[in-house]
Amino acid sequence: TDIIVGFPNETEEQFEETLSLVREVVYDSAFTFIFSPRPGTPAARMKDETPAEVKKARFLRLKELIDEQATYTASKFVGQIVEVLFDTVSKKDKTKISGYERHGRLVHVDGDESLIGQIKKVKITSSRTYSLMGEIIDDWRRSSKSWSN
């Protein structure tokens, strides 16, 4: 979702309507921007009397709300098992690999490049605002079945 604040002459009431909608929807994440005019568009020709500092303050309020919602929704994943398609080795830590679960959440686990392109079951152990940490359980499940025989 993309949300733009500071459209020319946006009122506080209009901005509050945006916040109300965001509270109602509860976004996992959103791309938020301060309006910038694009040449050739009707909005680029509009006179704008909303001060830049008001636009920035609104942007920060919106971002804070979306970050709170993202932190909350991410925390609900802790303890769940999700399927993750792995696609990247961490640039900072070569013992970590990352991928996405089916709803687009970024998931980090211990692993290496051999997992790239694979889908694995992962138990989510902790969360951050825009990502999840977990451990692969596919191999554990296979081996645990052999223990019960």
Which residues does each predicted region cover?
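Conserved C-terminal portion of the radical SAM core fold
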Residues: 1-41, 61-72
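Terminal RNA-binding accessory module
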Residues: 45-149
